[in-house]
Amino acid sequence: MKWMVEINDLDAVQARAIENIIDNQDENHWVKGFAGSGKTIVLTHVLKRLATARPPVKVCFATFTHALKDLIESGLTKTELDRIDISTFNGLGKMRNDYDLVVADEMQDIPSRVLPTLAKKSDVLVIAADLDQSIYRSACSVSELNAAIKPAREHQLREIHRINENVFEIATSVYTDAKVVSQTTVRQDDEQARMYEGASMRDEFVTMYEEAVRVSAKESPSAVLLPSKALLDKFISTIATANSYTGTPPSVKDSERPEIGEQADPFKEINAYLKKNKSPLQVFGGGSGSLYDSDTKKMVYLMTYHSAKGLDFANVFLPHLTEDVSLEPMKGASDDQERRLFFVATTRARERLYLSYHDEPHRFIEEIPDYLLETFNKQKRNY
């Protein structure tokens, strides 16, 4: 999957941040920036430089999700991977305690209970964190994060490369508390987000699936994001029935979660079922699925909003934005938590964004100005 940006294609601020971090490896560093400004890309280039440093540097990379861990691994060469330890935050306890420095992405989501473990790994932290994208209830407080990293050199990225102005305005029209620092620029193009009103859930899911397959290409996969694993099951079941898949699809929701720190592949059964039926669908996240598959064939990745954190895809679909759905599956979700999740989900889109619903639309849909959305019309089939 195309996501990594070559060093010569970085903007000047990104390049300076990398050089400053490499030149000051005995200090803490905090890379900041709006969603899509390239924080993960900066950290990945830092890892590349550290992996080839002489004398050798003992370095660990850590982040919250298996999906983002897998993404980082796909951006490194085999030689670089051999020289870097990579872990989720939950798996840090099994790592060594004498790193020269730890590089950590999505630090706004690190649980409070993991901070003492992180502190034992190294005296030097290089992190990326965007407080607007904090979506986990277990996440540490702002004061705890500041205490863990400061004093630190701050690197503020000001150019938003991933999303265009249309997606930026959609995301910030729903999550109006998103902080945009002065002199921030957003990519300009004519691509407009699309809205589809399904006649039923089946019509909505099948239509969005068919479009996701149509616009997918090698190295430019589509991603269908849904709020919960229960909805992933509904989506898969609907597509399986519509396409006459053989057998009953295993459940995503009931898949066994691995123990902390062990090798994870919780959706092995459902992905084997999809592969057997020659489906381009693949459940990605939690250690299951592979981004490498999209390098050689059309893929449609199926994920929860939470699992998509930190990733980006050429084509992003957000179905089931229907009146009665909560975007945060845990009970007692606040309005702010749902808005942050919508913000995170929409800002995964690198080229195309599709929103859809059936029956009555979710309140967030009604908050988006009409001029930001164009009506999606079904593609005519060629027989």
Where are the regions that the model predicts?
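SF2 helicase catalytic motif II
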Residues: 98-114, 125-128, 132-136
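Inter-Walker segment of RecA-like/P-loop motor cores
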Residues: 60-100
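Conserved coupling/interface region of RecA-like P-loop/ASCE motor cores
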Residues: 133-137, 144-190
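Core RecA-like ATPase module of SF1/SF2 helicases and allied nucleic-acid translocases
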Residues: 37, 66, 85-89, 93, ...
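N-terminal pre-P-loop "Q-motif" helix
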Residues: 2-27, 114
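Structural recognition of the conserved hydrophobic beta-strand(s) that form the central parallel beta-sheet
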Residues: 61, 124-130, 156, 355
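Walker A/P-loop
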Residues: 24-46
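Conserved interdomain hinge at the start of the Helicase C-terminal
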Residues: 195-220
